[in-house]
């Protein structure tokens, strides 16, 4: 277990919007989350009634009120690399204020809501577990949720998990799986002036490209538990050629398959192996999808509290990790996911208030929390 630094930076949870800005202006690129984890841990240890544990640079805080149900609320502390987009600044568009900067959308808005809720919600109608974890944006082997599950899976026990991914305040059920793989195409080198002496591996990619092109013509939509997912099969990278006057002796194409949760990871892999049976395949990564699970009673009641029509999560998120643990999970948080990872990443400030209000309404504690909407602007 990692210990907090002797003098962690202070995060003031009095005002939601100011807390949000402080979190954003606290750099925490993947594998550099330690100081922010220290600050988050310090906040949580000051809250009466929370049992706090730390594993690496992930922090877990739990209530123990004896409620019959437990809800887990999770958000990752890390961001993708900074590109001259910190410190943050406020930008107004059509009367709406946005905080602009790295991590605003993905996902320090969600982290701010969760940390504010943990600091102010003292008598929820369900026991709560808050998880602030490291390394979501990089390879799965570093993922904080995975490390917690390996070291202390009991900390993740819950009847429902809410992952505070940016969904623009809409509940998004489940997530699609993802498979990345390469196909190798062999050729034979020759001088380009005598090309007939060789075999051009780049040209021999054509059948693969034709399969990909033909695949785009079919309906990519898959209905799962009432939600309409959209699959994708796309070439994403290509490696070929040794010199401008040499016929390419080999080529390697990378393909990404995004598949709906009506199939397992194993079924998705089999489908790709059959589709591209004529070429050697190397699987780079394969992540399972998660079914929506919105028919579960807790999820149904939360969707009702949010009050909007739920949708599917097209990308892969850590709800799949909870699904593998047998825990129903959904995505819900402030921020438009279209802005995630962009250089001008931003989040509408009012979306934090809206997300907080939905959670408070569902947890039946309207009178306990004073929302940050009044005087909450940074």
Which residues fall in each region the model found?
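Acidic/histidine-rich catalytic neighborhood of metal-dependent amide-processing enzymes
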Residues: 112-180
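Phosphate-handling active-site elements
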Residues: 92-97, 117-131, 154-157, 212-222, ...
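N-terminal helical capping/dimerization or prosegment-like subdomains
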Residues: 2-77, 82, 250-256, 271-274, ...
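Generic recognition of long tandem-repeat/solenoid scaffolds
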Residues: 59-63, 94-101, 281
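Metal-dependent amide/peptide-bond hydrolase catalytic core
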Residues: 2-4, 11, 166, 173-174, ...
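Buried hydrophobic packing segments
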Residues: 40, 111-121, 145-148, 205-208, ...
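Short secondary-structure junctions
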Residues: 46-54, 90-91, 278-282, 307-311
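Active-site metal-coordination/substrate-binding segment of hydrolases
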Residues: 70-132, 144
């Amino acid at each position: 277990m990692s210990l907090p630094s002797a003098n962690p930076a202070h995060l003031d949870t009095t005002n939601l919007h100011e807390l949000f800005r402080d979190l954003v202006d606290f750099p925490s690129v993947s594998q550099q989350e330690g100081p922010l984890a220290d600050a988050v841990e310090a906040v949580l240890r000051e809250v009466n009634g929370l049992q706090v544990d730390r594993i690496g640079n992930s922090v877990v805080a739990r209530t123990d009120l004896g409620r019959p149900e437990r809800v887990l609320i999770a958000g990752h502390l890390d961001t993708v690399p900074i590109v001259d987009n910190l410190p943050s600044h406020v930008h107004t568009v059509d009367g709406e204020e946005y905080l602009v900067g790295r991590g605003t959308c993905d996902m320090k808005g969600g982290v701010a809501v969760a940390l504010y809720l943990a600091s102010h919600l003292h008598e929820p109608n369900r026991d709560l577990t808050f998880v602030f974890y490291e390394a979501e944006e990089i390879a799965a082997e570093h993922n904080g949720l995975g490390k917690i599950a390996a070291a202390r899976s009991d900390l993740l026990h819950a009847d429902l998990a809410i992952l505070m991914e940016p969904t623009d305040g809409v509940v998004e059920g489940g997530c699609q799986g993802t498979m990345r793989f390469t196909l190798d195409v062999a050729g034979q080198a020759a001088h380009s002036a005598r090309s007939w002496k060789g075999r051009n591996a780049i040209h021999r990619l054509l059948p693969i490209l034709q399969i990909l092109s033909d695949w785009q013509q079919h309906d990519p939509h898959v209905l799962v538990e009432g939600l309409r997912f959209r699959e994708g099969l796309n070439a994403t990278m290509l490696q070929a050629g040794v010199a401008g006057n040499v016929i390419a002796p080999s080529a390697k194409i990378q393909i990404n398959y995004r598949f709906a949760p009506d199939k397992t990871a194993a079924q998705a892999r089999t489908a790709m192996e059959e589709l591209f049976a004529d070429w050697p395949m190397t699987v780079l990564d394969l992540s399972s999808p998660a079914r929506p699970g919105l028919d579960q009673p807790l999820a149904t009641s939360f969707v009702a509290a949010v009050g909007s029509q739920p949708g599917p999560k097209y990308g892969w998120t850590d709800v799949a990790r909870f699904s593998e643990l047998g825990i129903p999970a959904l995505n819900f948080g402030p921020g438009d996911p279209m802005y995630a990872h962009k250089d001008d990443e931003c989040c509408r400030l009012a979306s934090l208030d809206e997300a907080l209000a939905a959670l408070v309404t569902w947890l039946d504690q309207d009178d306990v929390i004073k929302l940050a909407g009044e005087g909450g602007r940074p």
